[in-house]
């Protein structure tokens, strides 16, 4: 059964209300996925070609190292939270990590539960929590070809302009620009990997690729993904609108020309007797890697050991990125 966009919105809202706690044309295959070798293009909403300089305004500080900023992109006011590590000095370039919230959520929420401020302080990078736009229903989200009410938003162009802003004003390391996100924020991070050469790698926690989206990556990418196989919101094995998670993994392994794959059992930190699995595709071009954590009997959540999970996705995301 093929669901229309309105049905998808209703289903996502229902599932997120029940399940989400955050404890928060080209070749289409039968799976609905895209062959990375096909360069014929296809639909994908607004592109990322506009590099207009942003007029960024400070709204207010949250603390000495964290500030809320606003700007305008297209017809939308955009806001984002910036956290810089202690003793930040723009004379020295450091990495940048975008952190993206899920559908109906906010930058404030993922800033609160992800814990990336503390990791940024320890590892010396800038964390930027970007707020999605709000549709006419008052719902927040991203243009990722899943929820139709965001189709007119040029999110990719906005992130391209943000990257230029941080290069100019913060002197970030151009070779170490990353994005990660929860749920629809994971979808958005994948879209950035598909369209922006500047993105070195992405992390997805319970996100995926949209079935109705063409991904033609401009270069090789480092990919790390966490997903529960009992996720009822963005199912591990896919839906009519989201690609199966292991198919996404295989796509990026193919894109990166990875030659080998291994499977490792995740340590049972919470002693529940369930064995999760880490899939690693390696020996890839340009020293990239593609990693998938299949979390056994886990649902739609940001994984954290303090919440009873076997691992901390935030710590592992940065551990993966730091040497890339």
Predicted regions located by residue number:
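Sec-dependent N-terminal signal peptides
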Residues: 7-16
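Serine-hydrolase catalytic machinery in alpha/beta-hydrolase-like enzymes
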Residues: 71-87, 91-178, 188-191, 195, ...
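The conserved beta1-alpha1 loop
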Residues: 98-104, 206, 227-228, 296
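Active-site nucleophile loop of the alpha/beta-hydrolase fold
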Residues: 132, 203-211, 228-231
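C-terminal catalytic histidine-bearing segment of alpha/beta-hydrolase fold enzymes
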Residues: 222-226, 242-244, 255-324
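Acidic catalytic loop of the alpha/beta-hydrolase fold
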Residues: 230-234, 300-301
